[in-house]
Curated annotation (Swiss-Prot):
Oligomer and partners: Heterohexamer, formed by a dimer of trimers. The hexameric TusBCD complex contains 2 copies each of TusB, TusC and TusD. The TusBCD complex interacts with TusE.
Free-text function comment from the UniProt entry: Part of a sulfur-relay system required for 2-thiolation of 5-methylaminomethyl-2-thiouridine (mnm(5)s(2)U) at tRNA wobble positions.
Keyword field contains Cytoplasm: yes
Pfam families xrefs: DsrE
GO cellular-component term (any): cytoplasm
Keywords for this protein: Cytoplasm, tRNA processing
Protein name: Protein TusC
Keyword Transmembrane helix carried by entry: no
């Protein structure tokens, strides 16, 4: 089976991309264990706790990221540069445990995957 990477690069709640990506990730996890999740650019906002999507009439899907462990999805990476650019600290408690990587290391890790799906 091919190695699959899911890359979240958009902010939550502005579009359905994050929710659709999470749904695809959970569905794919039933078919393979060889996958990983990457949070880059505005996608790092997907990791923040305490969001209030109901204020913009959006569905609260962010809490579903907490289920990644139950689906045996353990390879989660977050771009350290993206965190800094957005004023976020890598020590921030995120909804899922994601390992911060600098951009070069993140690119090298991403190169290990055969299929890259971006949301």
């Amino acid at each position: 089976m091919k190695r699959i990477a899911f890359v979240f690069s958009t902010a939550p709640h502005g579009t359905a991309a994050g929710r659709e990506g999470l749904d695809a990730l959970l569905a794919t996890s039933a078919l393979t264990d060889d996958l990983a999740v990457f949070f880059i650019a505005d996608g790092v906002f997907q990791l923040l706790q305490g969001q209030k999507p109901d204020a913009v009439l959006a569905r609260d899907y962010i809490a579903t990221f907490k289920l990644l462990g139950l689906y045996d999805i353990e390879q989660c990476w977050v771009c350290a540069a993206s965190l800094r650019e957005r004023g976020l600290d890598p020590q921030t408690p995120f909804v899922v445990e994601a390992t911060p990587l600098e951009a070069d290391a993140l690119r090298r890790e991403l190169a290990n995957y055969d299929v890259i799906l971006r949301f």
